[in-house]
């Protein structure tokens, strides 16, 4: 298994992320690997969907896309999520460093 399989650059230009979210962190950041997922720490609390909305906003800003282009495919109620970012204008350096050279 490819050790960076948690991030896939889709053929249509979308980015699919397998993410572990840490809500109520001291600061927002892409932490790195967490098992076979990308760990992202966010300051928002996991109450009433605030963490999901904040995560979408954070990733949209990082990838320079509209919030409507960030979709939580799986994991709305948990910390383990699949997120699709449609046509990212920028891939954050923390994510680009983990991308497999075969998926670009």
UniProtKB/Swiss-Prot annotation:
GO terms for cellular component: cytoplasm. Pfam families: DUF167. SMART domains: DUF167. InterPro entries: DUF167 (IPR003746), YggU-like_sf (IPR036591). Disulfide bonds: none annotated. SUPFAM superfamilies: YggU-like (SSF69786). Belongs to the UPF0235 family. This is UPF0235 protein Sfri_2863.
